Amino acid sequence: MKSLLALVAGNLVTAVSGHGYLTVPASRTRLGFEAGIDTCPECSILEPVSAWPDLTAAQVGRSGPCGYNARVSVDYNQPGDYWGNEPVVSYTAGDVVEVQWCVDHNGDHGGMFTYGICQNQTLVDLFLTPGYLPTNEEKQAAEDCFLEGELSCLHVPGQTCNYNPDCSAGEPCYQNDWFTCNAFQADNNRACQGVDGAALNSCMTTIAGGYTVTKKIKIPDYSSSHTLLRFRWNSFQTAQVYLHCADIAIVGGSGSSPSPTSTTSTATSTTTPSSTSCASAISIPVTFNALVTTTYGENVYLAGSISQLGSWSTSSAVALSASKYSSSSPLWTVTVDLPVGATFEYKYIKKESDGSIVWESGPNRSYTVPTGCSGTTATESGAWR
């Protein structure tokens, strides 16, 4: 069966141009896309490599654990202006949280995927240091650490963890600690898009529209003021692996690591209590940073599906501040106290000087407020679409 599908894949490879990337929590790739730097976030690809049936055979090379997009020559293994300088979300050790990636309609190659957290802070710090690009050897060492720190499907009580239907017993891929896509040639709910069964354009890709792929992971008993969550998808159809990472913080764990001393970001960082026990927050301040180019008289607002964001009413939308705006960095920002665990949709809008409203394009953005100790903060960054 695999040899037949490989032949079919070989005949189709020139037609397949879209793939997938981590969206929740916001990966470095997603932030690069929203900032207008990455024109094809689903196109960070490690290829050609041995991706199947041995899921860990491929060396990550230049792609590293965070991905390299050759289309735009962006290496996400080092911090940039719009990613890598601070956590995008703070989690509490032991929590079960929802994670999501986006697969393109034209590049749903089936296969299996996994998440990992490397608990070697010295290694991780190499990927948090502005101006430093880790070597290929350091990238591989980090990927090995992420594989060791796998966040297994089986760690989440009650979660269904199936074997991949395109993998036979006895093959290295016959394991259910990794998450699996559905059968590549299934008549209904095929491959990775079949995991959620979501509608086309339920998430954003630039080739043919995307489908969400949602699972749950359990945050390990570990603490770090800034670390990385790595996502890896091994394709069944093609000789490709997709790697992405998101900057996160973890509080409340028994194991801990010192804050990185090599980073020099002046952006507001997520605060984390030093105690391993803490009072849980009821709400946390979430800072929304949006890159929106405006003209004199225009103002930017945040409208969303919850009451704190006006329940989609433009007259009750939350105003952003342009106090940090410049021609080179058109930043609008606002901090809103939001209830922990709340999941909502939102969009940015412009209010013109004549009172007219302009909504940004594309599907609604989505966000889940993290849980954490009292004093925890979170940041969500994006760019006008």
From Swiss-Prot:
The keyword Metal-binding applies. CDD domains: CBM20_glucoamylase. Its cofactor is Cu(2+). Cu(2+) binds at residues 19, 109, 242. It is found in: Secreted. The modification Methylhistidine is found at residue 19. PROSITE patterns: CBM20 (PS51166). Residues 1-18 form the signal peptide. Its main location: secreted. InterPro entries: Carb-bd-like_fold (IPR013784), CBM20 (IPR002044), CBM20_glucoamylase (IPR034836), Cellulose/chitin-bd_N (IPR004302), Ig-like_fold (IPR013783), Starch-active_LPMO (IPR052282). Residues 19-248 are annotated as: N-terminal catalytic module. Residues 256-276 have a biased composition (Low complexity). Disruption phenotype: Impairs degradation of resistant potato starch, but has limited impact on less-resistant wheat starch and no impact on processed solubilized starch. Residues 278-385 form the CBM20 domain. Keywords: Carbohydrate metabolism, Copper, Disulfide bond, Glycoprotein, Metal-binding, Methylation, Oxidoreductase, Polysaccharide degradation, Secreted, Signal. SUPFAM superfamilies: Starch-binding domain-like. Disulfide bonds join 40-43, 66-245, 102-203, 118-145, 153-161, 167-173, 181-192. GO terms for cellular component: extracellular region; membrane. One of its GO terms (biological process) is polysaccharide catabolic process. The catalytically essential N-terminal histidine His-19 is post-translationally modified by methylation to prevent protonation of the histidine side chain, and protect the critical active site of the enzyme from oxidative damage. Starch-active PMOs provide an expanded perspective on studies of starch metabolism and may have potential in the food and starch-based biofuel industries. Modular lytic polysaccharide monooxygenase comprising an N-terminal catalytic module and a C-terminal starch-binding module of carbohydrate binding module family 20 (CBM20). Starch-active polysaccharide monooxygenase that oxidizes the C1 position of starch substrates, but not in cellulose, chitin, polygalacturonan or esterified pectin, nor with Arabidopsis stem cell walls. Catalysis by LPMOs requires the reduction of the active-site copper from Cu(II) to Cu(I) by a reducing agent and H(2)O(2) or O(2) as a cosubstrate. Belongs to the polysaccharide monooxygenase AA13 family. PANTHER family: BINDING PROTEIN, PUTATIVE (AFU_ORTHOLOGUE AFUA_1G14430)-RELATED, CHITIN-BINDING TYPE-4 DOMAIN-CONTAINING PROTEIN-RELATED. This is AA13 family lytic polysaccharide monooxygenase aasA.
